[in-house]
Amino acid sequence: MRGRLPVLRSLHRVGRVAFLLATVAVLNDAAFAAQQEATAPQKTVTDKAATVKKVPQTETPTTEARKDENLLVTARRRNQMEVISGGQLGALGTKKGLDVPFNIRSYTSSLILNQQSQTLGEVLENDPSVRTTYGYGNFSEIFVIRGFPVYGDDVAINGLYGITPRQLLSPQLYDQVQVLNGASAFLNGAAPSGTAIGGNINLMFKHAQNTPITRLTGDYASQGVGGGSLDVGRRFGQDKAYGLRLNVAGLDGQTSIDHERRHSVALGADFDWHDDKTRISLDMNYQNQGVNGGRPGVFLGTDITGVPRVPNASHNYGQRWTYNDLNYIFGMLNIEHDLSKHVTLYGAFGGLGSDEKGNYSTLTVNNSQTGAATAGAMYVPYAQTNESTRGGVRAHFDTGPVKHEINAGGSALWEESRTAYSMALSSFDTNLYNTAAVPAPTENWTGGNLDNPLPTSRTQLYSLFFSDTMSFWKGRVALTAGFRYQNMLINGYDAYTDGSRTSHYSEDAITPVVGLVVHPTRRTSIYFNRIEGLSQGLTASGTNLVNLGQIFPPFKSVQYEIGAKYDTGRFTTTLAFYQISQPNSYTEPYGNNGSFIFRENGLQRNRGAELSVNGQILPGLRFNGGATLIDADLRRTAQGLDNGHTAIGIPNYTINGNLEYDLPFLRGATLVGRVENTGKQWVNTANTAHLPVWTRFDLGARYTFAVAHKPLTLRFGVDNIANTRYWASAFNGYLLQGLPRTFKFSFTTDL
């Protein structure tokens, strides 16, 4: 396939072979360990007694049954759907949700395993405040939180930006997927791509726990995607100070969309060490993902006034020669050291190297009745080299009746992006409903070096932060105040000709934060925050501009939020009300001589309410989900033409509900169900066409039982059980179709 280097094909094959070898090795190791345990002499109480020959004791059926039951109880508890209130809050560290003035929750690795999630977007289908769409013209996942996007470049790992695979992400390497609703410039700094204004996603690597684990999983999804994973964790040394966690996962095959194939390989090695004062972890990872013949998003021609009907749920209107192949090597080092019981120093350093290639084709519908469309072809290689770091100090002390937690530190990110392209000069005819296979067009219009792309941008982000969280009245009231100084240095280059620098941006900003938490009772809290989002300002560009080249300071988005939380440990609920105002830009006529002016006077104001409920409602009955309402209002638009209209692709409401029910008459059996409901979405800023409301139902079951004194869990599920055809998203002005009915099966056993 064009653009896929032989070395990358070799890496992919090596990853698959490594998976098989690791599986065989661990199975052999487990069998050997079991044999050694069975033949090893039993320990005695005294040295004298050691000379007495011990007679092996055979366990009675009752004892074996009791052991099996204990294993099953543990396995069933581990399989339960769990969403944790709280998570890692950047500058503030890891906190319980009840104690912070922000709305944050964490989806665990057990949930990821039980739902057979293969991408980050599939994990976030559980969240009522998140909707997923594709990137512009490709198959990357973009997440929409509170009406604003989070690009893959702006997803963090353990609070570090710039080290995450940016298009598609394999979730099997992570212990938690954490979602923060709301702006986060103080907490995490400015995101490198300028998104994450309405929310932030943070991933936490798996590390070895005190209980050893050797977990083997096999997966299947229709129409023919097969895969599996191996998760091994051990602690060793004195006081179990050393830990090692190894993860291998992969899949390959045709999805439930006609002629679409996906493949992935993920390898992770996580090492950690600790003593009484110091904690060190090192995480190293490789990931490959790819899509062949993927179903793309759908653009609408300028003359289209209505939304075309939705094609058959499994119909693929893409071309089979399209593909992407994404390779990433990434990792990080974390260090914490307690100077005393009141003062902790910490630091982290991470890096990413990526090599992406793809041949893309996105169709544009020109007749919504017949589905007549045109499409083009473009090959794009893209590479990144990123480095990211942070460091700081966290201190606790008292001043009279007031307890203080001081957080101070800084962060830095260096990012270089390189790209090129080749494209077909003319488009070809196609159809949304009756799509014929078309030979790949000749792509003879080239920009840049396809084999060794030149830099298109170099980004340097530096920041310093300080905050003080003051607690009063035995912790019943906590007030957080702080700020982050952010500097942005961004250079643009002509990657398509001589590589010369074409733009220079160097600006800074200070973003404050104020947060208040009041605990009326031990299990409840009321909170408020005022925090900002931050993104690069623009430089005036265009034709006949009177302010051509004017550089604008960074965009500051302002959020106000108030809410309430209830947390019993097994059950949590959060109710939040918020407003986020984000500036934007436009060009409008200036005078009567054909001149224009570039302004940053526009505004998008998103107001909304969020309700989330997680945990055990009744014994054996668990629920995770909630609902959101949002009003995404456009204000101060160019010449006032769209004032009061709703922003494109933001539904007026969303509902998600996940339910688990343990069958009382069959121990170990659990029924699972999920519903997703998404409200009306406008397709254009004129608000003349919109997507209808859509609803999707998923059903499934799992059963845990013992085989040879080992727990085995079988799972079966059906996503979109009614095979509903629907347009899932209109974000950014293009349509994304929902997935067809998909059957899933998996097994997991602890060896």
Predicted regions and their residues:
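Conserved C-terminal beta-signal and adjacent last beta-strands/turns
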Residues: 6, 406, 528, 560, ...
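Acidic, small-polar-rich N-terminal luminal/periplasmic segments of exported/outer-membrane proteins
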Residues: 64-211, 562, 732
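Acidic/polar loop-and-plug regions of large Gram-negative outer-membrane beta-barrel proteins
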Residues: 251-255, 268-338, 351-384, 427-453, ...
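Membrane-embedded beta-barrel scaffold of Gram-negative outer-membrane proteins
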Residues: 334-338, 344-350, 354-360, 527, ...
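Structural signature of Gram-negative outer-membrane beta-barrels, strongest in the C-terminal barrel
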Residues: 384, 403-415, 453-582, 606, ...
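Gram-negative outer-membrane beta-barrel transporters
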Residues: 474, 579, 599-685
